[in-house]
């Protein structure tokens, strides 16, 4: 079984930058966001169920999911959010396991934005948190998504606190400074994870 390092961080923390740095070193990525998009592609049973519940206006003209409209439907409706999660989470989990099982590298990077929120951190061998201050999170999110400060604060408030996330971390990358430092930090962690993965394999075979 491949050693699994889960990568997480709050919105605007720069998870993609860190994930890409690992990918540049040849580490295979399994990305929960990409899988979440795949399970609701046109023609899937999940998208049909969503359209059946909310009507055809939840779809774009090309038949794909209108994510903004869906977010609006569920953002303040806990019951609808629970329904959507019960539909999608098993599908995402199934596809995640399929992808992880197909990896023959010493370790894989499992990129999960809501790792702590969904209580998934126990499914990884190691948890790496990308950390920045809330002010940086807000500024980056507003700039990237073109949203107001209030909207960005609402998203931040819907995620676990910085302290809760850090409490689950085995390793932390501070992504508030020089981007060049990220590559160095990732290279160091890569070396450590290769050692940990090798040790875990040896333990299995003893």
Curated annotation (Swiss-Prot):
Record-linked PANTHER family: BIFUNCTIONAL COENZYME A SYNTHASE-RELATED (PTHR10695:SF46), DEPHOSPHO-COA KINASE-RELATED (PTHR10695)
Pathway annotation: Cofactor biosynthesis; coenzyme A biosynthesis; CoA from (R)-pantothenate: step 5/5
GO terms for MF: ATP binding; dephospho-CoA kinase activity
First-listed, main subcellular location of the protein, grouped into a coarse class: cytoplasm
UniProt superkingdom: Bacteria
EC number: 2.7.1.24
Catalytic activity entry: 3'-dephospho-CoA + ATP = ADP + CoA + H(+)
Keywords: ATP-binding, Coenzyme A biosynthesis, Cytoplasm, Kinase, Nucleotide-binding, Transferase
SUPFAM superfamilies xref list: P-loop containing nucleoside triphosphate hydrolases (SSF52540)
Transmembrane region(s): none
Compartment(s) where it occurs, according to its Swiss-Prot or TrEMBL record: Cytoplasm
One biological process term in Gene Ontology: coenzyme A biosynthetic process
UniProt family annotation: Belongs to the CoaE family.
DPCK domain location: 4-200
Role this protein plays: Catalyzes the phosphorylation of the 3'-hydroxyl group of dephosphocoenzyme A to form coenzyme A.
Any one GO CC term of the record: cytoplasm
Gene name linked to the record: coaE
InterPro entries: Depp_CoAkinase (IPR001977), P-loop_NTPase (IPR027417)
Binding site for ATP: 12-17
Name of the featured protein: Dephospho-CoA kinase
Source organism: Yersinia pestis
């Amino acid at each position: 079984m491949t050693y699994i390092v889960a990568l997480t961080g709050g919105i605007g923390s720069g998870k993609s930058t860190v994930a890409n740095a690992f990918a540049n070193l040849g580490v295979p990525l399994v990305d929960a966001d990409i899988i979440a998009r795949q399970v609701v592609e046109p023609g899937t049973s999940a998208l049909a169920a969503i359209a059946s519940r909310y009507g055809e206006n939840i779809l774009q003209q090309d038949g794909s999911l209108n994510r903004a409209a869906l977010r609006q439907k569920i953002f303040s409706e806990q019951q609808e959010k629970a329904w959507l999660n019960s539909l999608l989470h098993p599908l995402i989990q199934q596809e995640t396991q399929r992808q992880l099982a197909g990896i023959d590298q010493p370790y894989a990077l499992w990129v999960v934005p809501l790792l702590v929120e969904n209580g998934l951190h126990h499914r990884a061998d190691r948890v790496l948190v990308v950390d920045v201050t809330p002010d940086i999170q807000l500024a980056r999110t507003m700039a990237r998504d073109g949203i107001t400060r209030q909207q960005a604060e609402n998203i931040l408030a819907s995620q676990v606190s910085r302290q809760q996330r850090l409490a689950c971390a085995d390793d932390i990358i501070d992504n508030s400074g020089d981007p060049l430092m990220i590559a160095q930090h990732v290279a160091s962690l890569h070396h450590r994870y290769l050692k940990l993965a090798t040790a875990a394999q040896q333990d299995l075979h003893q």
